[in-house]
Design a protein with these regions (language model features):
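Sec-dependent bacterial lipoprotein signal peptides
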Residues: 1-20
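Membrane-proximal, proline-rich intrinsically disordered regions
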Residues: 22-68, 103, 119, 356-377, ...
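Conserved, well-structured interaction surfaces
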Residues: 42-48, 55, 79-156, 174-210, ...
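Short, surface-exposed recognition loops and adjoining beta-strand edges that mediate ligand/DNA contacts
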Residues: 63-76, 155-170, 206-247, 261-345, ...
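Long, intrinsically disordered, low-complexity segments
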Residues: 102-105, 177, 186-187, 192-194, ...
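Extended amphipathic alpha-helical segments enriched in small hydrophobics
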Residues: 143-144, 252-254, 445-494
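Flexible, polar/acidic helix-loop-strand segments at domain edges
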Residues: 370-453
Length: 593
């Protein structure tokens, strides 16, 4: 096993990086038979070591983990999240596992950090030191990111009641290393995370930009002898897409909110005020609420914006993203079958019910005006932007989709493996200017955002409500109320009556914030983890909507049970991989697994 892990350190050839404009960011590493000492002589070889850490970024694509929650089911019987939600989740059958890749990523980072100062980055000594600083900053940021994802998937209480994280490893590991080490406490892991963030922030620019004057050079680098040309050579716009200070701050916001949440707060050493402050640092850099993208809620559908993205550039809504590529993969998987799709991800009635009516009231509130006989009328505009409901239009020809019982291949449960199981199809993430007809089979550009500013706004709202109350601001200029108001207004909900009512109670505002998060970040891999950190119920049955006609031809809407959720209480925390426990006796498993 030690030999296998040691080999990770030397697989530095030919990188297939999942980065924006990856070909411009890294040169392929030299053949690995040169030996690791070659790092000192060849900068591209050294870059290959760090590049191998980049290839292990867990947020490179959407996992559609919503299928494991109350928000969606899949019509694919082999879907791992569907099987997990049905009771097959074990420590050796774990779709949520991040141990292997994130631990390997940290190993690459540690090796890189141990050699970075000796690498011949440039002939010019000032440029060489600048390169070393930037590369170290990236590596520290990457190690912090990997720690966050490891804690999200594997932290938990052991049988003795201690909240544990993962082993904190900050030095290179080799054939003679002792891999049989215990897990650190969760709080120790968070301290290591924050330390890496601080180290990264001391070295990285907020954004990679080309500067024009010495006034823009940080004092630390000016003392090294940096000038405008050297700064642009090392920290210029061509490095967009790599780890920068704004990304590090965003992960600090994510991790702090995670640690302050009910599932971890008792032994994390992090509180909601810290989480609010860290989120605000990110948001203040874009002007706070005034920097919110008015079209951010439909980032995936802004076709002209996506098509025009150049290498390394980001839309206003997106802080960090994956590479832009031309394909029709999401549409092939999720368009309704009448449009040559597989209809894989089916939003649930539970999710549809989360959308308020146009006046902002929940559908369960009599003041909402919700009509169960016409359930999709007068609703939050985000509903039909994110979900294909009965009668919705999809694709280049605005084809009407009928999900009624017996209405054709798009009808509920008509064709096993291609028709919807809930009466709904996914619309969010999909471009509507794609034609899957085999005679056409058109493709369009897509990308996966790794961090959206909307997430950070929602992080702030959640933490600020808990720390300061609905309208409290702490040391900042905006409140949880202000953020949620802006998010709802940009989606078209401009009646603030219900929002104002929620602002009278921290509990009511918490409920509203969580619901807005559920809607805004839907199908982007959040809810599975949010439910767990909140210690919210996990076993709500996934429901659908059967639509039939009465004798007069009027539609009759009948909610139906679709799929059970079989989770045990210990499943608020994910397991340590069973294979690791077999090899290392010092590792303790989380309780219940």
């Amino acid at each position: 096993m030690k030999t296998r892990k040691y080999k990770y350190l030397f697989l530095v050839a030919a990188l297939g990086l999942t980065l924006t404009s990856c070909d411009d960011l890294f040169e392929p590493a030299k053949e690995n038979n040169l030996g690791i000492d070659y790092m000192d002589k060849d900068a591209s070889y050294a870059e290959g070591v760090l590049g191998n850490a980049y290839t292990r970024i867990p947020c490179g694509s959407f996992p559609f983990s919503e299928v494991g929650t109350d928000d969606a089911v899949s019509n694919d019987a082999t879907n791992n999240w569907r099987k997990l939600a049905g009771g097959t989740w074990t420590s050796n059958n774990n779709p949520t596992e991040r141990w292997r890749d994130c631990r390997a990523g940290i190993m690459y980072v540690n090796l890189f950090l141990s050699r970075v100062d000796g690498v011949h980055w440039a002939d010019d000594d000032v440029a060489r030191r600048l390169y070393a600083c930037r590369e170290k900053g990236e590596a520290f940021g990457m190690r912090a990111m990997f720690m966050y994802y490891l804690l999200q998937a594997h932290a938990g209480y052991d049988e003795s009641g201690q909240l544990l994280g993962v082993p904190v490893v900050t030095t290179p590991e080799g054939a003679s290393s002792n891999f049989n080490v215990p897990r650190n406490t969760f709080e120790e892991c968070m301290k290591a995370f924050y330390a890496d963030c601080d180290s990264a922030l001391a070295l990285l620019p907020d954004k990679y930009v080309d500067i024009t004057s010495d006034a823009s050079i940080p004092a630390y680098y000016k003392k090294m002898g940096a000038d405008v040309d050297r700064m642009n050579r090392v920290f210029g716009v061509k490095f967009n897409g790599r780890m920068d200070a704004s990304i590090v701050k965003a992960f600090r916001s994510k991790a702090a909110l995670f640690a302050a949440s009910p599932a971890f707060s008792a032994a994390s050493g992090t509180n909601y005020q810290q989480a609010a402050d860290y989120a605000a640092q990110v948001l203040d850099a874009i002007g706070g609420i005034s920097g919110m993208d008015p079209n951010g809620w439909t980032w995936y559908a802004n076709g002209s914006e996506i098509d025009a993205l150049s290498n390394g550039a980001n839309p206003k809504e997106v802080m960090w993203r994956g590479e832009k590529s031309q394909n029709n993969d999401w549409e092939t998987d999720n368009y309704p079958p009448s449009l040559y799709g597989k209809g894989r991800i089916n939003p649930t009635q539970n999710f549809v019910d989360a959308f308020p009516t146009a006046n902002g009231y929940p559908v369960t509130d009599p003041r909402s005006g919700y009509d169960a006989r016409n359930p999709y009328a007068n609703r939050d505009p985000r509903l039909t932007a994110y979900v294909v409901v009965d009668g919705g239009q999809v694709g280049v020809n605005n084809t009407k989709i009928n999900t009624e019982v017996g209405s054709g291949k798009d009808g509920i449960n008509t064709e096993v493996g291609s028709s919807t199981r809930t009466g709904y199809y996914l619309r969010k993430l999909l471009r509507q200017d794609i034609n899957l007809d085999p005679k056409v089979n058109s493709k369009q550009y897509h990308y996966t955002p790794r961090i959206r500013y909307t997430e950070i706004f929602l992080n702030y709202a959640e933490a600020a409500n808990e720390a300061f109350g609905p309208k409290g601001t702490g040391t900042h200029s905006y409140s949880a109320y202000d953020v949620i108001k802006a998010i709802r207004h940009r989606a078209g909900i401009t009646d603030d009556s219900y929002l104002d009512e929620c602002a009278q109670s921290k509990d009511k505002m918490r409920e509203l914030i969580r619901n807005e998060r559920r809607i805004e970040l839907s199908f982007e891999g959040f809810r599975f983890w949010d439910l767990r950190r909140w210690k919210a119920p996990l076993t709500a049955e996934a429901k659908g909507m059967n639509i039939t006609a009465d004798k007069d031809g009027n539609k009759v809407y009948t909610p139906v049970d679709v799929e059970d959720r079989d989770y045990k209480d210990y499943m608020y925390y994910g397991p340590i991989p069973y294979s690791e426990l077999l090899k290392f006796t010092e590792l303790k498993q989380n309780k219940g697994w």
